[in-house]
């Protein structure tokens, strides 16, 4: 019998939970979302970096549930916009966290800008908090550029407008398997797996 290690993922975002499960479960983790453990408290994301926000979430939930917690803060950084939307990615177009409105705002701000000036990256900071241990962090990223219009049916967030470098596909045009090999979250999770196994 294989013993699974429980990992609580500090998010209410079903898209993120799905990615975590697809990447961590084959590595022997029993992944549970906040909803699955009945944690409904909203955690303020007041950090100035992805890493600060991930640490805040991981430590707050770990303290409440007394279990290992993995938290992620991730987003899109666009060079031509000075790194925006950055830590404000989820609420770029307003507090309602509307993916479509966020996409429309980015496309509007980049209207008429040439492809070479639309470079961007998805960044993901992961923090793992284990009661009684120091919180550890890793960061992953994937390079690309912003499309002129949304393409694809998969994924969530900015996936329909983020074209992966060296591919002619947006993240939303990639299958889960394809995305999980190259995404910023996959990159960070691979680093986190090595850290947890050390």
Swiss-Prot record:
InterPro entries: dITP/XTP_pyrophosphatase (IPR020922), ITPase-like_fam (IPR029001), RdgB/HAM1 (IPR002637). Homodimer. This is dITP/XTP pyrophosphatase. Substrate binds at residues 11-16, 74, 156-159, 179, 184-185. SUPFAM superfamilies: ITPase-like (SSF52972). One of its GO terms (biological process) is purine nucleoside triphosphate catabolic process. The active site is at residue 73. GO terms for cellular component: cytoplasm; cytosol. It is an enzyme of class 3 (hydrolase). Pyrophosphatase that catalyzes the hydrolysis of nucleoside triphosphates to their monophosphate derivatives, with a high preference for the non-canonical purine nucleotides XTP (xanthosine triphosphate), dITP (deoxyinosine triphosphate) and ITP. Seems to function as a house-cleaning enzyme that removes non-canonical purine nucleotides from the nucleotide pool, thus preventing their incorporation into DNA/RNA and avoiding chromosomal lesions. It catalyses: XTP + H2O = XMP + diphosphate + H(+); dITP + H2O = dIMP + diphosphate + H(+); ITP + H2O = IMP + diphosphate + H(+). Binds 1 Mg(2+) ion per subunit.
